[in-house]
Amino acid sequence: MSQKFLFIDRDGTIIAEPPTDYQVDRLDKLALEPDVIPALLALQKADYKLVMITNQDGLGTSSFPQETFDPPHNLMMQILTSQGINFEQILICPHLPEDNCTCRKPKTALVESYLADGVMNSTNSYVIGDRETDLQLAENMGISGLRYQRDGLNWTQIAKQLTQRDRHAYVNRVTKETAIDVNVWLDREGGSKIKTGVGFFDHMLDQIATHGGFRMDIQVSGDLYIDDHHTVEDTALALGEAINIALGDKRGIGRFGFVLPMDECLARCALDISGRPHLEYKAEFNYQRVGDLSTEMVEHFFRSLSYAMACTLHLKTKGRNDHHRVESLFKVFGRTLRQAIRVEGNTLPSSKGVL
C-alpha cells in the first residue's frame, strides 16, 4: 500500500518568517508557529510521513551565507527531533528566482522520487505551506494543498482536518432480481434513509444503524411479487460489502462481545472483523413471518452479511415473542458492531499484520 506524505514548507509554516528580510539567519529570529509540535505529532500518529521542502533564496551566497543559516535551522531540527517529530527528508532549494532552476517551488524536481508509481498515496497526501507557490506545488504534484494561516487554517485545524476520519463507502448491486444502492458512513450518526419495500425489514436495518452509531442509506427495488428472499439476501450482501470497504485498512478498530436483554429476550452477539466469514446462529421462532418479513430470512440475512463483510459472527437469542426475538438480534448486532468499528488508536489489531 502506498504511503501518505505531508510536504511541509518551513518559513511561515513551521517557524515564523521575519517580515523584514524573510531570512531566519540568527538564533533570536527563530520562533515556532503556534501548536506546530502537537499537530505534527498527531499527524505522525495518523501514519503521515513528513517531508520538509523550502526555498531559501541565495543560500550559500554572500546574501545568505550557509554559516548564518545553519545555527537556527539546526536548533529547529533539534527541538523537533527532541519532541519525537521526524522528517524523512529536508529538501532545500538554494537558488534565486532569476536562476531559473528546476528545483525551486512550485517546480517539482526536489520531489520527483515521490511521484513515481506506487510511492505516494496521492489521494491522502498534501502540501502544507503559507504561500501561493505551495498550492501551485501541490497542483503540479497532483495532490491537495493546504494554505497555512496562523489566524485562519492553523496547525490545530490542519491536524483535525487530516486526522478526523469520515469512513464512507457506496455499493451499487444490480441483478436480475434486485437493484440496490447502499451508502454507509461509519463516522456519522443519525439521518439514515432505508427503503427496501419490506417495512419490518426497514425497521430492523434501522436498528443496526441506530445501535451501531453510524448512518446508512439503503434503496432497494426487488422482486417482492415473488417473495422477500432476494431482497433480504442481496441487501445483506451489499450492506456487508459497503461496511467492509468503509472500514478501509482497519487500523485502530476494536473487537467486542455484547449481551443485550430485551423484555423477556436475551440476545448474545460476538463479532470478530477477522477477514474470515463465518456464522454461528441459534434462534427459534413460532411463526413464519413477523410483519411482512419471513423469519427464516433472518438467519439468511446474517449469513449473507457475515460473508460479504468478511467477519466471524456468533448470534443467539432466547425469548417468547417473535417480534422481540428478531429485533433483539438486530439490536445486539448493532451494539456489537458499534464497538468493533470504533477507532481506538492507530495500530492494526492483528498479530498477522493484516485483517
Swiss-Prot record:
- Reactions accelerated catalytically: D-erythro-1-(imidazol-4-yl)glycerol 3-phosphate = 3-(imidazol-4-yl)-2-oxopropyl phosphate + H2O; L-histidinol phosphate + H2O = L-histidinol + phosphate
> Which residue ranges does the record annotate as region Histidinol-phosphatase?
1-166
Please name the PROSITE patterns in this protein's record.
Answer: IGP_DEHYDRATASE_1, IGP_DEHYDRATASE_2
| Positions of the catalytic residues | 9 (nucleophile), 11 (proton donor)
Which cofactor is essential here? Mg(2+); Zn(2+)
The positions annotated for binding Mg(2+) are 9, 11, 130
Entry-linked CDD domains: HAD_HisB-N, IGPD
Q: What is its main location?
A: cytoplasm
- Family to which the UniProt record says this protein belongs: In the N-terminal section; belongs to the histidinol-phosphatase family. In the C-terminal section; belongs to the imidazoleglycerol-phosphate dehydratase family.
Give the protein name, as stated in the record.
Histidine biosynthesis bifunctional protein HisB
Q: Which gene holds the coding sequence for this protein?
A: hisB
